[in-house]
UniProtKB/Swiss-Prot annotation:
The keyword Protein transport applies. This is Exocyst complex component exo84. Residues 36-55 have a biased composition (Low complexity). Keywords: Coiled coil, Cytoplasmic vesicle, Exocytosis, Protein transport, Transport. It comes from the Eukaryota.
Amino acid sequence: MDGRGLTLRSKNRRPRPQISAPKPISGPLPQNHQPAASGSGTASSGSGSRDYASSNHATSDLVKRRYSTRFNQVPDFDGAPPVPSVPQVPSAYAGLGPPQPSRKQSAESSGPPEVDLTALRDPSLPVDRYVTNLLANASEDDIREYQQALRKVKNRTSTDLQQNVYQNRTQFIRISQEADKLKGEMKTLRSLMAELTTALGQTAIGDSPNPMSPTLDERASKRSNRSSVANLESMWNVQLQTLWKTVEGSQKFLPMVPGRHIVLETGNWAELDSATWKPRRPVHLVLLNDHLLVAAKKRKRVDQSNPNHRGPVPTKLIAEECWPLQDIDMIDLGANLTGSAREEAEDRGITNAVCVRVGSKPFTYRHDKRNSTAKSELLATFRKTVEDLRRTLRSETEAAGKNGESLGFMSAINSRNSLLCSPKLDLSENTDNPRDRPEVRIDVDGKQQNLRWVDSQVDELDIDIALQRFEEAVSNIDRLRKLARGLKGNAVAQDVINTKVDERAAKLAGILSRSLVDTHGFPVATKTNVVWLTRLGFEDQARESYLKARSDVISKRIRTYQQCFPSVMTSACIKWAKHHLDAFNALLTRQLSSVQRGATVWQNCINIVHEQAGILAEVGVDFTDLVAKELELTEEEKAARPEMTRSESLIMGLADAASFFNMYGH
């Protein structure tokens, strides 16, 4: 074994050790046995340990060689191509994936899902898929809270939309007014440039004699007239420049326009509160030939550290309001007062006050001196100035109309159509001079108003519709329609008012129809909406909207019940009921076979059967037409109805007696 070496596959194995049977120890071993055993063990311990160590080392080396592997060519892992990247999910569907399950399933939910406004603003959002993925693991309470959050977002969005509409409408009105002012200034500049061009052209003409030219005397008279007009214009320009220096901010209200001049300037006035008649601030009134300027008196800033300052506090005038004379009315508040009312008005000083009405806004001004004639002078001058202005505008309009007659009838028709179709009526578009404006006035409650007043009323109507003040909007539409019907002699104003009012009425009717559809289940709201639509003249639209809403509800309920009770279950139920009904009819026919048809007993039995069928009809099972269908009497049998036999009368008597005994016997 030593010559061939050690191997694990050697067939010459050592014999297995045999374990001897246990030997009982009955007494101590002999003394000569212990040394011998110990001596032999000691002698063989050195050689045995060395042989065991060498054999153990060789065996472990062979085991390592047996279970080890040698690779001649190691694969090159560094030279392998890179792993391809995962494709990105589109951003529109990034949040629509299924919710990943959490590692820790908590007993309590993490709360309702939040409302993602960014996702809801996406117009291409797949709503069904989004809601399904969002509420996949939500409880009933979470879904209810999420629904309430969506309602709050909807209400907040609706409120923001209404506020934005109102703000945009107000800004649009303000911008349109500024555009009108800018348009007037541009036309004024155009006219001034035209006059300048004409003057330069006239100066370029030579002084050659003309046989058609006037004489020297005529030239002198015309030159004097021109010089007087020029002097008057220069004087008016000086007045305006002085006004600009005296009243701060008046130049933006009253720019330099040819022919504009000051007619009357009066002070010592106070603006009053229209509700309490208490003075607000001292004002200064300036009446021009085409405008009325109101300037407020305010104190100047004074250096208190200056010791030389003495006397009253200096004041300055600041322009606050300026209105065209065509847009205002001036009323004497003390003209129609009598008796105790006049005495009370005199105590308050109202007899010296005037009211300036601009559209629907009143402004009250009172003179400080009660015995002064400033109020009467202001009223007389105002009326005379307004009359002169109207006469001038009328003459200029007639002259412009005569010059434009050569354009023909079609041009007039086209201008009228453009006037009616324009969203914002402006009669100054066809004229080059702001003074060449056709004056279209209407009579409103005994007062003359122009079409700007109509535009202001239409603007208020738009604001009422935007703020959903439906009662005020419907009342304003009725009032404007009544006003248009009264303008029989003014076709242009009547057409303009009807066009604008009909457009707003159609818009308001659409809003009310949608409200009627949303609240058709509430009687009070439905009645209110129907009344408003009837007043607007949209009865047919109200009827169709209400009936369509009710039809949609009925169709929805029918679909709901059909989903709850499929056709298979319905057919089985009807089949079961028909089977039992046929069995009952057969039993009833068999029981009444021994009774004569048409007799009293027969008829009583049929009546009882129909009463029982009526009870079933009360719970929704109507078998009245099918119960005892073949036992009904014909018309001939009813006419030839037999009399009750003796046995039948006896049976009926016993039955009546039994019923009477049951009722009163106990």
